[in-house]
Structure formats: C-alpha cells, structure tokens
Amino acid sequence: CPFEVIDTMYKDAFTKFEPEYILPFLKNVASSYINNDVRLSDGRIGKVVLINENALSLPIVQCEDEFIDLSKTRGLTVSAIL
C-alpha cells in the first residue's frame, strides 16, 4: 500500500534523505490519493478526504457519514487503495 511506503520514507526523512526534498515530495504523493477509495485495516471501505500534515501516512477517511482521523485511531490504517 502506498501509505506504508510513505510511512517508511517519512521515518527515514531525516537520516537517509534530505528533508527539504523528501518532505514536500511525500506530501505531494500523499495528496494525490485525496478522493480515492481505500480499504481500512478493519475491512471498511472509505474515501480519503484530507491528508494530515503531521502524519502523512494516516489520512482522514470518510466511511459513509463518519470521518475517521487515522492519526487518532490507534491500530487503524489504510490497507489498500481501491
């Protein structure tokens, strides 16, 4: 899943990459998934509605009428882009 790659690269941003280049790159990659349907790790299907600038791999996802901030929901992640 692309959000797992974003998470891995973000963790290495200050040790293996130049932060002034990798952080804007990761932000743009994450933002490209806004309005994409995703499957969450609990099986629910939702749509990425907003990228969290402090946790690029944990966007805000809309599942039906509920908005889920993955950065505040422990253990819940995007498992697949649909």
Language-model-detected regions and their locations in the chain:
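Terminal helices and disordered tails flanking the catalytic cores of nucleotide-processing hydrolases
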Residues: 1-82
